[in-house]
């Protein structure tokens, strides 16, 4: 009983600590719902309307971040960013711009539930703007280009046998200096031209799947 109470107190303390470390970066385009954002429970719903799976783990929340010159590797992280809000946004807690000559780095640790043993583990990103490289335990597990499309990576072979796993994501977004569709996003916003959206901006999650599993569902009419 005492052990259960201690665990509950420690969990509550950690949640309070995380909340205290994060705050919006200014009041830019802030709505009444911004006050409800909690770093310990960010967009908790299953993010994919089709193919919802019973077992999954939400990786939204506070990650470490760094902004470096393009091609450089961070020697240390600058602080924490609230995923899945773009680094330029208020709710990210950062509110910084990333130039085409820079790259945005994310890092966090995660554990895999013991009940997933023997299954493939898929790492899913709802969207990352624009070009993303992903490593698990210093093993590159994939790359994706495109700021509006979800993607999944099989990270099973890169996982540690037990304990923590390290996830690193590097993002490069040239915005209007690149070839990608970008709407009104520009590097120098003014008038009708808007601030860029860089990095992870949709939910990140992982889930176990069988060796043979459904990857996509297409519906067609008669």
Specify the residue positions occupied by each region the protein language model found.
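Bacterial Sec-dependent N-terminal signal peptides
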Residues: 1-21
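N-terminal pre-domain segments of enzymes
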Residues: 21-56
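Short glycine/threonine/proline-enriched tight-turn/helix- or strand-capping micro-motif at secondary-structure
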Residues: 41-47, 89-93, 107
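Short coil-to-beta-strand transition motifs
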Residues: 54-58, 102-105
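Aromatic- and Gly/Pro-rich amphipathic surface segment
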Residues: 76-98
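Short beta-strand segments of immunoglobulin-like
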Residues: 217-222
